């Protein structure tokens, strides 16, 4: 990972240290309406924002894990909730990114299997805090955090146009299918990208920063830019 959001993995920052940043996170001038109006003025039809990335920190008020923007920061406001309200007010569709496999805050977060070869020396899982890969069990992470949080975002933030998943490295087929089915249960019109994994998707997401030379035939797709 060469992106800013990968800094915890790139530098192997322990959760105890990385988590201190949350205690200093207080963007008091954050204005969801300003963001949404700018997006709409630029001609955007929908707005996708990160609800949880690989570091495991939720930008919504999660009852599943207190490592979230409401409970773990002095800011204390539900960012996703405010963006959702602004989107509905200004007629912009909203989608959410959610990291359903990698989670560096959970001891059993994905990316630890033997075939998950480090990229440029950076491991996919949190091997600096939780080095015992042999005893990791992604099922615990999925059941304790991933699935319940996906249910939260489906049930608590109104109509979503899509869920943008990422990095399906450890998910079993039945887990991908469980998430797919939950989305269709709570939000029948919500689209699901192919990075949910195991063939459970509505449309294809290309590789990061990949722009095809020509339009793929017979498939709906989006570039990950």
Q: What function would you assign to each model-found segment?
A:
Residues 1-225:
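Mature catalytic domains of secreted/periplasmic carbohydrate-active enzymes
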């Amino acid at each position: 990972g060469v992106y800013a959001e990968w800094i915890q993995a790139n530098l192997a920052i322990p959760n105890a240290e990385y988590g201190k940043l949350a205690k200093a996170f207080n963007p008091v001038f954050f204005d969801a309406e300003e963001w949404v109006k700018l997006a709409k003025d630029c001609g955007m039809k929908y707005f996708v924002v990160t609800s949880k990335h690989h570091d495991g920190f939720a930008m919504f008020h999660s009852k599943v894990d207190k490592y979230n923007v409401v409970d773990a920061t002095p800011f204390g406001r539900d960012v996703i909730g405010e963006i959702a309200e602004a989107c509905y007010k200004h007629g912009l569709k909203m989608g959410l990114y959610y990291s359903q496999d990698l989670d560096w805050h959970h001891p059993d977060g994905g990316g630890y299997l033997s075939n998950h070869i480090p990229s440029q020396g950076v491991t996919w899982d949190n091997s600096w805090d939780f080095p015992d890969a042999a005893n990791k069990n992604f099922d615990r992470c999925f059941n304790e955090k991933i699935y319940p949080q996906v249910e939260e975002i489906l049930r608590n933030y109104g109509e979503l146009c899509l869920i943008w998943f990422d990095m399906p490295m450890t998910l079993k087929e039945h887990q991908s299918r469980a998430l797919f089915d939950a989305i269709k249960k709570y939000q029948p019109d919500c689209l699901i990208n192919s990075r949910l994994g195991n063939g459970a998707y509505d449309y294809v997401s290309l590789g990061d920063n990949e722009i095809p030379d020509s339009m793929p035939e017979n498939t709906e797709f989006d570039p990950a830019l």
